[in-house]
Swiss-Prot record:
Homodimer. Its cofactor is iron-sulfur cluster. PROSITE patterns: HESB. GO terms for biological process: iron-sulfur cluster assembly. GO terms for cellular component: cytosol. This is Iron-sulfur cluster insertion protein ErpA. HAMAP family: Fe_S_insert_ErpA (MF_01380). One of its GO terms (molecular function) is 4 iron, 4 sulfur cluster binding.
């Protein structure tokens, strides 16, 4: 596990929502894990899940007392990005503002580099 300054940001809006969800679950050990998988209409897609574990090699980013966890393989695609949260007409969701993405699908859930 490394806790260093990495060029990946965890927005205040995302941290606030994670904090609220953790409180609902009544499990302060939970962390938000962001990861990249193959798939989607553009080649790669983002995934978000809650995880109690931080694996060897994972990078952690802390904001407002909550932790974002990223595995080393996913981190290489997320450098310079911002993990954020929005609520709007399309619903509420976590998303990544990713400067490495050369194309994205219409909903923003998948991308290519």
């Amino acid at each position: 596990m490394s806790e260093v300054n990495v060029p990946l940001s965890f927005s205040d809006a995302a941290a606030s929502r994670v904090k609220a969800l953790i409180a609902e679950e009544e499990n302060p050990a939970l962390k938000l894990r962001v990861y990249i998988t193959g798939g989607g209409c553009s080649g790669f897609q983002y995934g978000f899940t809650f995880d109690e574990r931080v694996n060897e090699g994972d990078t952690t980013i802390v904001n407002s007392g909550v932790t974002l966890v990223v595995d080393p393989m996913s981190l290489q695609y997320l450098i310079g990005g911002v993990v954020d949260y929005t609520e709007g007409l399309e619903g509420a969701r976590f998303f990544v503002n990713n400067p490495n993405a050369t194309t994205t699908c219409g909903c923003g859930a998948s991308f290519s580099v």
